[in-house]
């Protein structure tokens, strides 16, 4: 596996990773209605191109076949909005390696605190990376009640 910066040609694959991850992995922790609100359809690939150009660092994990298998992003303020792994690559350490690279980027940029709003399946992952749970957030997404967890990690 190799981790590199996003390329425009990755956008379609990242959209598919997001959608399949939410539908399959998220579906193990949320109701069908919640999952459908979170990922009502395959996102437009342009969403990922825009994310890569809005000032955040967008990293992509490339599998043995040369195709993206996971991705994660880091904003200049320390916010990690996305870390998504294809269901086929889940549980193999890909997300951990991707997170470690995002943390390395954060440290080199002088970021002192990382924060996330972690989904139910991501909560345990972030706790293993040293994040502390701040609070559970209850909110509506596309009109459906859902929750996530506000978490943070001080970098020292």
Task: Put a short name on every predicted segment.
Residues 1-3:
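Extreme N-terminal starter segment of soluble prokaryotic enzymes
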Residues 5-8, 16-90, 99-101, 105, ...:
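Acetyl-CoA-dependent GNAT
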Residues 13:
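Charged catalytic carboxylate motif
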Residues 55, 79, 112, 145-147:
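Exposed loop/turn and edge beta-strand positions of beta-sandwich/beta-sheet ligand-binding modules
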Residues 93:
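Conserved G/P- and acidic residue-centered "switch" motifs that form tight phosphate/ATP-binding loops
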Residues 106-119:
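Conserved GNAT acetyl-CoA-binding A-motif
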Residues 115-117, 132-150:
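Conserved catalytic-core motifs of GNAT/GCN5-like acyltransferases
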Residues 126-127, 131:
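Conserved active-site tyrosine of GNAT-family acetyltransferases
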């Amino acid at each position: 596996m190799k981790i590199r910066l996003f390329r425009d040609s990755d956008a379609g694959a990242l959209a598919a990773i997001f959608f399949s991850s939410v539908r399959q992995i998220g579906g193990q922790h949320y109701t069908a209605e919640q999952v459908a609100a979170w990922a009502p359809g395959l996102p437009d690939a342009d969403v990922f191109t825009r994310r890569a150009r809005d000032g955040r660092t967008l990293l992509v994990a490339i599998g043995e076949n040369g195709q993206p298998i996971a991705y994660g992003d880091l904003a200049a303020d320390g916010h990690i909005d996305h870390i998504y792994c294809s269901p086929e690559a889940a549980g193999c350490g890909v997300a951990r390696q991707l997170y470690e690279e995002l943390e390395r980027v954060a440290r080199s940029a002088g970021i002192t605190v990382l924060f996330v709003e972690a989904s139910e399946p991501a909560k345990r992952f972030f706790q293993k990376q040293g994040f502390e749970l701040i609070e559970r957030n209850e909110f509506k997404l596309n009109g459906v009640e859902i929750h996530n967890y506000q978490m943070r990690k001080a970098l020292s």
